[in-house]
């Protein structure tokens, strides 16, 4: 199997940091997870098991790695209350994305202790997201209506707050 999805989520059903935090964290990481998942598929990076999803979940519990269900390598990342308070105090999107990247990198390194994880390839995807200005945009479709002389370009823009 190949890696097809990279997620940064809160531990299911609750992270231990409160429902309000859990909901906002999920929405704030959505754009990054979508970007990483769309781009990791193009790389055709093989896994060492029957999973195609690398899920890094924040929690108050201890760090651990396990293969769960049929297709998921689940990495639980212990995050302290002080890290959460620092995160909540961040005002810029760039700071938040860098915090997400640091969590993902911790997850990759933890998973790599017991599984084959292409850390360098994943880190290149992080850099690609930075180089694009922390934006998740892509061309959806181009259509030419020759009889009207119109060229239509449809682009997707996914931010932490909306999807257009």
Enumerate the language-model features and the residues they cover.
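Structural motif
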Residues: 160-164
């Amino acid at each position: 199997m190949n890696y097809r999805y990279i997620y940064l989520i809160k531990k299911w059903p609750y992270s231990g940091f409160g429902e309000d935090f859990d909901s906002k964290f999920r929405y704030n990481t959505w754009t990054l997870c979508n970007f990483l998942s769309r781009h990791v598929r193009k790389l055709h990076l093989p896994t060492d098991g029957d999973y195609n999803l690398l899920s890094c979940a924040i929690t108050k519990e201890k760090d651990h790695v396990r293969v769960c269900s049929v297709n998921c390598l689940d990495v639980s990342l212990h995050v302290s209350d002080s890290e959460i308070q620092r995160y909540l105090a961040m005002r810029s999107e760039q700071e938040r994305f860098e915090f997400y990247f640091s969590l993902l990198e911790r997850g990759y390194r933890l998973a790599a202790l017991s599984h084959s994880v292409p850390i360098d390839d994943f880190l290149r995807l992080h850099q690609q997201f930075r180089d694009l200005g922390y934006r998740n945009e892509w061309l959806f479709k181009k259509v030419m209506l020759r009889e009207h002389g119109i060229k239509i370009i449809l682009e997707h823009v996914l931010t932490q707050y909306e999807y257009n």
